[in-house]
Amino acid sequence: KIRKVSASDIMTLALKTGEEIQAEVTRQHLSSILAAEGGIERCTLSSLPAVLKAKSRGIEVSRISQHSREKGRPMDSVELEVYAAFKYAAQRQLKMIPSLEEVNETTLRYWAPIIMKKACQSCHGKKGVHISPKTQKLLQKQLSKDQAFDFEEGALMGLWRIKIPKKEIIKSL
């Protein structure tokens, strides 16, 4: 069966797909942190079922931040611009709405804010207040370049970046 699909149809479903993946990854991530004492080893995404399912469809789920846990690849110019827009909204207490961009003819990129939650304070909160000395030592040992702390509850910690192949969206229409 042949069906005409508009760019609007693709973008609408891609935004919905990004929102669903982000919501499920966030749910699984928080559940795994709450289930573990300390949570440090649970703060990785790669083994979460929602991330593995997305990966099997060619969808890449990742996080970016100006305050990274480990020294990784610096943000590119587009990532810096998107991050700056979300940071601007956060500083002015504006609603931060997930967005979708067309990277090229074959790929879409979904962005959404990562907001500091109470469950994250034991590793990302204030040292000596939320982060225990034991956890501080463990973080220093495992993540010597860690900058992802001193966040207040409700603060912008980073962004979800989900790269979605258009063909995956078209298959779903």
Ranges and model annotations:
Residues 125:
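Short Cys/His-rich local motifs and their 1-3 flanking residues in nucleic-acid-associated proteins
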Residues 1-119, 128-173:
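Extracytoplasmic c-type cytochrome modules immediately beyond a signal peptide or single-pass transmembrane anchor
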Residues 122:
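Short, cysteine/histidine-rich loop/knuckle motifs that typically chelate Zn2+
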